[in-house]
Amino acid sequence: MKFCPMCGSSQAHAGVTVCQWCDHEEKPLEELSKQEIDDLMASYEYEWIEDGVRIVEVKNIRDIALRGAVGIPHFVTEIAADAFSHCKFLARIGLPEGLRSIGDGAFAHCRDLFDVFIPKSVTHIGNGAFANCYDLGVICAAAPAQPDGWDTDWLSECSARVEWSSTDED
């Protein structure tokens, strides 16, 4: 599934540079106005970090539940511990290339989550990041093998198998 790199809409299509839902053209973080960033991040508590934005938590869980599928904007480089924890109606998450870190328990207890692609840029995944995600059967990861920075227990209480060297087209 493709996601708009700007608004996270699951309706974006490969090769399209302007999303039909948000009318945003993909542009680098430094070219976005504060208002554009605030609009794109309206569902999240977030903070600026050295080289991007960290999602701290979901502040509008109802919005996430209504969409079911969420794409994280391209300028997010970190997802904090427990940021999406207990978003029980979250079914799909689109993680952008450029994301570096997924914190402890970031998606723990997302009981309906079944579709995840982890881009190669992710060098750290914390303990229990996908713990108790019971509907998650397969996780597609771009890395050829588990990177050293991923906690050995990142899939705690989750029976998903990992398909290494995957592409987001799989």
Region spans (language model):
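Flanking scaffold residues of small Cys/His-coordinated metal-binding clusters
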Residues: 1, 14
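Short cysteine-rich clusters marking metal-coordination/redox-active sites
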Residues: 4-7, 19-22
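Short Cys/His-rich micro-motifs in 6-15 aa windows
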Residues: 22-31
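Consensus positions within tandem repeat domains that build extended binding/scaffold surfaces
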Residues: 60, 81-83, 104-106, 126-129
